[in-house]
């Protein structure tokens, strides 16, 4: 009878699982949310000190700081 009570207590304690943030690891997410050789970030809107260079997928902008922008040679 004691082991039955112990098992019931364990089931009750294990059924109460605390909420955990699910999803991709934050380090992996950081790699996939970057663009332009890991110097830019994929965002909806670029910040004040950033400029838009290319697209990330179909709906996000690759925002790069001006100092990280590649030099474009023009004839």
Swiss-Prot record:
What is any one GO biological process for this UniProt entry? defense response to bacterium
Gene Ontology CC terms, in alphabetical order:
extracellular region
Q: Where in the cell is it found?
A: Secreted
The primary location reported for this protein is secreted
Q: List S-S links within the chain.
A: 35-62, 42-56, 46-63
Q: State the signal peptide span.
A: 1-22
Q: Which stretches are transmembrane?
A: none
The cross-references to Pfam families, in alphabetical order and at most eight, read: Defensin_beta_2 (PF13841)
Domain of life, per lineage:
Eukaryota
- InterPro entries in UniProt: Beta-defensin, Beta_defensin_dom
Question: What keyword terms does UniProt attach to this protein?
Answer: Antibiotic, Antimicrobial, Defensin, Disulfide bond, Secreted, Signal
Instruction: Give the similarity note.
Output: Belongs to the beta-defensin family.
The free-text function statement in the UniProt record for this protein reads: Has antibacterial activity.
Protein known as: Beta-defensin 30
